[in-house]
Amino acid sequence: MVNERIKFFRGLYPNGSIITEIVSNIEGVCIVKTSIIVDEKVLAVGHASEKDGSSFINKTSYIENCETSSVGRALGIMGIGIDTSIASFEE
């Protein structure tokens, strides 16, 4: 899960940054970009998109869900918390 990936990242890189940015939020479709930065270097970038109302959680929290997915993807691209794919089914 993303929370475990964040904990692991913080343990490895206590001074690292996880920077999220809403790239677009038009007509209920949100796109978020996440950059993982350590020592002023971008180590990974992840993107995610979510549609308002497309699932139970997205009825109220599609932007938050999109941000979490983007963070999880960026950390996965770094190799944190992946076994077989960047995102798990639950994520």
For the regions a protein language model found, what residue spans apply to each?
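Polyanion-binding surfaces on beta-sheet-dominated domains and ring/shell assemblies
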Residues: 1-91
